[in-house]
Amino acid sequence: MRYFIIKSLMALTFVGANAAAQDHEYDLPIKEHIFENGLKLLVIERPGDNRVAAKIWTDMGALNEISGEYGAAHFLEHLMFKGTPTLGARDWETEKPLIDEINATEKAMIAELNRARNDIRERGVFHDYQHEKTTPEITRLQKHIDDLERKVEDLTVEGTTMKWYQGFGGTRLTASTEQEYMHFDIDLPANRVDIFLRIEADRMTNAIFRKFDAERMILVEQRIGFLNRLNSRYLEAMEALVGRTSNVYNPEGYMTDFKNYTRQYERYLYDTYFIPNNSTLIFVGGVTMDEMILKVEKYFGGLERKPEPTRYYGQEPLPSGEKRLIYRDNKLSPRVELRYQIPGVGHPDKPHFDVIKEVMQNRLQKNLDDKEIGGSVNVSTMVVHTNNYGLPSSIHFAAIYEDTEKLDASEEAMLAEIKLLSEENISDKELKFAQKTLRTQWYRAASDPNRLNFLIGHFEVMDSWKTLKPYLETRDKTTVEDVRRLVKQYFISDNRTIGKVIPRGAGQ
């Protein structure tokens, strides 16, 4: 059992303090307690607050998926909202045998799918040829599962968890799954935090995967909605080109993945990763560590420590050559984009790239405007849905135009500016402005219990919550020499992916 407190002298009321000061401290009075079963508890006490932002984080996400089942982690999040024997069940004694029969029938279906693997395998580039789309036995088993699911639906009550939370003043009931994490969260009156603990302890151990195929179709609808955005297919094509092996770059399921989801695989993910020694409870608000230790022990203390989950093995090969994408689309605005792989959180260089991102946003826009190339410049570290990872990801420099006339000139200008930054220092004024912008963003986030909770939890799953404060401090210590060094080291041709969007029929 360990117990830590990190404190600084600076309170959040100092948001307006002199940003030009050389030393900046960050108020992170985080207390940590680790229970015997490995469950971690983090608390920021805010005396006087009558509410608390509560989240439970699990170190599991899209990284842990296998090919052909991408999106399975996100799907598991949906299933874990479907209740337990005590939440959402109208008659559990009648429902349980039906659930058992569904699982047994699915097991038989998996065996039949495996037996018929050569018959039903997709053999066409354009998904247009299988010897057989199904077998009579697969059809029969699926119909039996559908019949059983309808019986189960008659025995369940939708939205039980939501009703509990709303009945006791809960707001912001959300959940999210990304590459490295899943979290469930709620904002509650501080004196109602037991509701959260009771529900989440139950969810961690007793989740029932109800309405499996109905939820599968919700993911299909979400995927269709995503693909209807003009830039979605382009972004996925770029991410697939930047990353060769890492699941960081994979989407939340291709359309071909959804049909492959099974209760058996979802149960494997659930049993493997949703365990006390792979989870962290975080509270920011009007609670104390002493009271939360007692409450968490009451609801989670009896849960058994399990074997450590399988770690993620994927690792990108060393950068070995420039890659290019020509993406043709008549609706998406023409653009040129440069992407470079950068290190993940926990690497000593990573905080400096936050500063570089801010510097480059202003510098590239000014440079293109001064050369009368113009365009709308966007500098980002967003990969799929997330800006930060504990693994290598990428930084992007994009310029968007109304037509293709200036794309080549824009690419040349951005490459020239990057080359210049590898040879000459930026101005001290540019550096200070970027650092001030980052501090302002941090203080705004830290003043919101929910956003602060997210940042602490995100760093915990990427590396450690203890990395957060040094990370922020390192950004303030970034020098012009650091910027030049990293541009020279990382922004090289062998580590570069270039994408261009042009209309169909344009170019070669």
Where are these regions (language model features)?
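Sec-dependent signal peptide recognition
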Residues: R2-A11
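N-terminal signal peptide c-region/cleavage motif recognized by signal peptidases
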Residues: G16-N18
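Cleaved targeting-peptide boundary
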Residues: A21-P29
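An aromatic/glycine/proline-enriched structural segment found at the starts
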Residues: D23, R203, A207-K211, V220, ...
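M16 family metallopeptidases and their MPP-like homologs
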Residues: I44, D49-E65, G71-A73, A89-D202, ...
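Catalytic Zn2+-binding segment of zinc metalloproteases
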Residues: H78-G88
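A conserved hydrophobic secondary-structure block that centers on an alpha-helix together
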Residues: Y261-Y268
